[in-house]
């Protein structure tokens, strides 16, 4: 189920404050955040936001195509590890 339109998008207050400060100052320094559940809003376009994935900070450059998505979508938390390839075939 999606979020109600009347509530509006969720964005952490500290992240929103930092984005507004960066836009006002004109600096393009990466903003670090743990808030993976925050929605990307149009005010963030052009900024780089470093999202924590539990181990490292993943830099995400915000473009117009990313508006409406969540920050956590672009910082994967799980690493894919495939099974070892066993070439032990009987009869060769």
Swiss-Prot record:
The protein, known as: Small ribosomal subunit protein uS19
The gene coding this protein: rpsS
Pfam families the UniProt entry points to: Ribosomal_S19
Keyword check for Ribonucleoprotein: yes
Lipid biosynthesis keyword on record: no
One of the protein's GO biological processes: translation
Job of this protein: Protein S19 forms a complex with S13 that binds strongly to the 16S ribosomal RNA.
Entry keyword set: Ribonucleoprotein, Ribosomal protein, RNA-binding, rRNA-binding
Record-stated family: Belongs to the universal ribosomal protein uS19 family.
InterPro entries: Ribosomal_uS19, Ribosomal_uS19_bac-type, Ribosomal_uS19_CS, Ribosomal_uS19_SF
Gene3D superfamilies per the UniProt record, alphabetical: 30s Ribosomal Protein S19, Chain A
Gene Ontology CC: cytoplasm; small ribosomal subunit
One example GO MF annotation: rRNA binding
């Amino acid at each position: 189920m999606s979020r109600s339109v009347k509530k509006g998008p969720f964005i952490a207050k500290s992240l929103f404050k930092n984005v507004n400060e960066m836009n006002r100052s004109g600096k393009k320094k990466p903003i670090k955040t743990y808030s993976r559940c925050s929605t990307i809003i149009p005010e963030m376009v052009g900024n780089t936001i470093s999202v924590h994935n539990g181990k490292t900070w993943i830099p995400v450059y915000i473009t117009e195509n990313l508006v409406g998505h969540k920050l956590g979508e672009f910082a994967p938390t799980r690493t894919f590890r495939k099974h070892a390839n066993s070439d032990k075939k009987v009869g060769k």
